[in-house]
């Protein structure tokens, strides 16, 4: 269905530019702010293209009910939710199969980066609320979630940072737009820990060749260097603002 519709809509023009004017390896604008919620242990807000996502972190705290505890390490519970007004057609409130699947893969990705062994019998709750959706929400939410965890002071082996790539009109492109996600031939979200290059999330929707997959991975790995810098700047800016406030 996706490939049939792609034939009807031209997503790459004769100048090899995408519908939004970007080149093949160009990111959409990204802005991250840390420490935006006073009542959460840690929080972050991200705008990535048209995505607007808020993340709140609570914990580590004793896991409840007790039968859910793991004696060896903390349990990371990510809850990804799309607000009813986040998409063009009003979304029915509450979890569905897609949001449950995304919550699971984000929980697993964050568990790989957090030093969960330091907190036996504990849980860390990560609430990801999509206020406005514009393709790539799972990666944007995960990228903001790791900033919120750092804001909460949760010990981590490394931050998690990710991006998407995909196949559009036969070309591999970085950071799919909404139209490219809907009508392109393939979508590949990947998240890594930059220090080691370990992949903590990788999925694929659509068909690509082996060479195209490696091309997508190269594009994403290069993009994560830029996105990782934006994450660090968000955390540094929070403490700069605090220092200015205390100085006054």
UniProtKB/Swiss-Prot annotation:
The biological processes this protein is annotated with in GO are: gene expression; rRNA catabolic process
Entry keywords, A to Z? Cytoplasm, Exonuclease, Exosome, Hydrolase, Nuclease
User: What domain of life is recorded for the organism?
Assistant: Archaea
E.C. no: 3.1.13.-
What InterPro entries does UniProt report for this protein, alphabetically? ExoRNase_PH_dom1 (IPR001247), ExoRNase_PH_dom2 (IPR015847), ExoRNase_PH_dom2_sf (IPR036345), PNPase/RNase_PH_dom_sf (IPR027408), Ribosomal_Su5_D2-typ_SF (IPR020568), RNase_PH (IPR050080), Rrp41 (IPR011807)
Q: Which SUPFAM superfamilies match?
A: Ribonuclease PH domain 2-like, Ribosomal protein S5 domain 2-like
Top-level class of the enzyme under EC nomenclature: hydrolase
Q: Where in the cell is it found?
A: Cytoplasm
The record's listing under Pfam families reads: RNase_PH, RNase_PH_C
Molecular function in Gene Ontology: 3'-5'-RNA exonuclease activity; RNA binding
Chief place of localization: cytoplasm
Look up the record and report any one GO term of the cellular component aspect: cytoplasmic exosome (RNase complex)
**Described purpose of this protein according to its UniProt entry:** Catalytic component of the exosome, which is a complex involved in RNA degradation. Has 3'->5' exoribonuclease activity. Can also synthesize heteromeric RNA-tails.
Its family remark reads: Belongs to the RNase PH family. Rrp41 subfamily.
**Assembly and interactions?**
Component of the archaeal exosome complex. Forms a hexameric ring-like arrangement composed of 3 Rrp41-Rrp42 heterodimers. The hexameric ring associates with a trimer of Rrp4 and/or Csl4 subunits.
Q: Which HAMAP family match?
A: Exosome_Rrp41
Its recorded name reads Exosome complex component Rrp41
Q: What lineage, starting at the top, does this entry show? A: Archaea, Methanobacteriati, Thermoplasmatota, Thermoplasmata, Thermoplasmatales
State the encoding gene: rrp41
């Amino acid at each position: 269905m996706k490939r049939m519709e792609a034939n009807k809509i031209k997503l790459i023009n004769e100048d090899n530019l995408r519908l939004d004017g970007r080149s093949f390896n160009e990111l959409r604008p990204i802005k991250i702010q840390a420490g935006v919620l006073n009542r959460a242990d840690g929080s972050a807000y991200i705008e990535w293209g048209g995505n607007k996502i808020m993340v709140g972190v609570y914990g580590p705290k004793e896991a409840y009910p007790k039968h859910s505890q793991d004696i060896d390490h903390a349990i990371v519970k990510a809850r990804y939710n799309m607000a009813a007004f986040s998409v063009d057609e009003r979304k029915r409130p509450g979890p569905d199969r897609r949001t449950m699947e995304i919550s699971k893969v984000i929980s697993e990705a964050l568990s790989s980066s957090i030093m969960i062994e330091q907190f036996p019998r504990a849980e860390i709750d990560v609430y990801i609320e999509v206020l406005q959706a514009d393709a790539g929400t799972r990666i944007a939410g995960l990228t903001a979630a790791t900033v919120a965890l750092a804001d909460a002071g949760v010990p981590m082996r490394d931050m998690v940072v990710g991006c998407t790539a995909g196949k559009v009109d036969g070309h591999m492109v970085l950071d799919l737009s909404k139209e490219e996600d809907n009508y392109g031939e393939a979508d590949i979200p990947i998240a890594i820990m930059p220090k080691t290059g370990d992949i903590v999330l990788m999925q694929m929707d659509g068909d690509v060749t082996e060479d195209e997959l490696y091309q997508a991975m190269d594009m994403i790995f290069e993009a994560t260097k830029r996105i990782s810098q934006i994450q660090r700047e968000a955390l540094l800016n929070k403490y700069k603002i605090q220092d200015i406030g205390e100085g006054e």
